[in-house]
């Protein structure tokens, strides 16, 4: 029987700061911490791998002074950017006492994925890998033993507020099955159109345990309500109460 670690990974609610007021990012991370989130995700986009430009390591580093919650950085950047700036991203993502922050490299952007993931670990980060909706699960099979998290994109990255792609559930369950078979302690994250409804519910039932929400959390009157609602629906799904796809 597989260890509990492989099958019942803790549920984590992780806001993406894309919909935040970027001119008040320090206050935003402080508010998110008070809302009870598990981590905060920074979507790094270089205008090359995706058609948008967002945050560099300096902004992430500046936010560290305003809260103690752990960070994760998703590198939606070209291979050149990933390789030349990796050390800065890993440093900026570290916790308040230098704990390893989650640094997510995209499988599609990196020809030498093992090298990148190994280097993240070596630099004191928590190596993780992301894949776009069209990318098959097989693309990450050979790096599962090197990573702490696998991020399954449920939209094509580049912009916030896009509609969730429901056909990723098979990929999530195949991934969880493989992780259990190999008895690995790997978290599955989902990102894109995740809300406190059937989307988070079905992803959780399929085997995901980390849920990234941007507009799905910031749409609430308070961030705490958003965080609590997302967590409740995920925990309900884990207890067997899975919400159906709307007709």
Predicted regions and their residues:
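Hydrophobic faces of well-ordered beta-strands that scaffold small-molecule active sites
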Residues: 11-17, 40-42, 63, 71-75, ...
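Histidine/lysine/aspartate-rich catalytic loop segments that bind and position anionic ligands
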Residues: 130-170, 174
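Glycine/small-residue-rich loop that forms an oxyanion/phosphate-binding "nest" at active or ligand-binding sites
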Residues: 52-120, 129
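Glycine-rich phosphate-binding active-site loops on the catalytic face of alpha/beta enzymes
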Residues: 98-109, 151-162, 206-226
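Glycine-rich, proline-tolerant flexible connector loops at the mouths of alpha/beta enzymes
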Residues: 39-57, 155-163
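Conserved, mostly hydrophobic/aromatic
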Residues: 25, 32, 43, 89, ...
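C-terminal helical cap(s) of enzyme catalytic domains, especially alpha/beta-barrels
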Residues: 219-247
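Catalytic cores of alpha/beta
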Residues: 29, 81-92, 135-146, 193-211
